[in-house]
């Protein structure tokens, strides 16, 4: 919902969708991995009720508070919380520049998934069976920054660590259109 713009402005980077993604009424929890604009997307967050439960890294807290959200739970890597019948464990994620979060999420029957959007696998995670891994499967580089998504590099390690039934690809671009200097 709404364009994605990275500071300092649209001339630098802008992502747009032709069709808005509708937000379902029955969503009762939000899980944020990072406080960056493409993860903690203000136009999308404005569509939610202010009392929705949000699990996030510290980098997202100030943004969420400014938007008026009232049920914010900050998790640091290795911390766990039980929420809405789920056990949510934060794992160390991408250093952009501070360490952000990945998550292991399991229901009461032990079914669940692992997610980390930049292809960083926390070396402290012990091998375990998990149903699905949500991860990029490609590497992405930025001029003057270098590799910031390491999906192709981490995928074999994720499969070895979690032995997932499913790998769900993220960070592929989808139907988005990108403009700006960063996209050149």
Task: Identify the residue ranges that each predicted region occupies.
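Short active-site oxyanion
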Residues: 48-54, 112-113
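Pre-active-site segment of Zn-dependent metallo-hydrolases
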Residues: 1-31, 43-47, 120-128
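Helix-loop-beta element that forms the nucleotide-linked donor phosphate-binding surface
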Residues: 64-74
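Cap/insert and terminal regions of metallo-dependent hydrolase folds
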Residues: 53, 59-62, 122-184
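Short, polar loop motifs at secondary-structure junctions
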Residues: 1, 57-63, 76-79, 119-121
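Divalent metal-coordination and catalytic microenvironments
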Residues: 34, 41, 88, 118, ...
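Catalytic core of the metallo-beta-lactamase
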Residues: 82-134, 149-154
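Active-site metal-binding loops of divalent metal-dependent hydrolases
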Residues: 1-5, 34-35, 93-94, 117-120, ...
């Amino acid at each position: 919902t709404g364009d994605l713009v990275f500071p300092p402005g649209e001339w630098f980077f802008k992502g747009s969708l032709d069709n808005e993604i509708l937000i379902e009424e029955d969503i009762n929890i939000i899980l944020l991995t990072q406080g960056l604009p493409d993860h903690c997307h203000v136009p999308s967050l404005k569509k939610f009720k202010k009392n929705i439960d949000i699990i996030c890294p510290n980098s997202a807290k100030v943004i969420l508070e400014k938007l008026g959200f009232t049920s914010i739970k900050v998790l640091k890597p290795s911390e766990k919380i039980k929420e809405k019948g789920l056990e949510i464990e934060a794992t160390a994620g991408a250093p952009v520049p501070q360490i952000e979060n990945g998550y292991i999420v399991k229901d009461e029957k032990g079914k669940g998934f692992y997610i980390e959007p930049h292809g960083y696998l926390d070396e402290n995670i012990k091998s375990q069976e998990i149903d699905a891994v949500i991860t990029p499967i490609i590497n992405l580089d930025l001029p003057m920054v270098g590799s910031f998504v390491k999906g192709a590099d981490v995928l074999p390690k994720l499969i070895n660590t979690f032995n997932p039934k499913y790998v769900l690809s993220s960070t592929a671009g989808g139907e988005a259109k990108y403009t700006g200097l960063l996209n050149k």
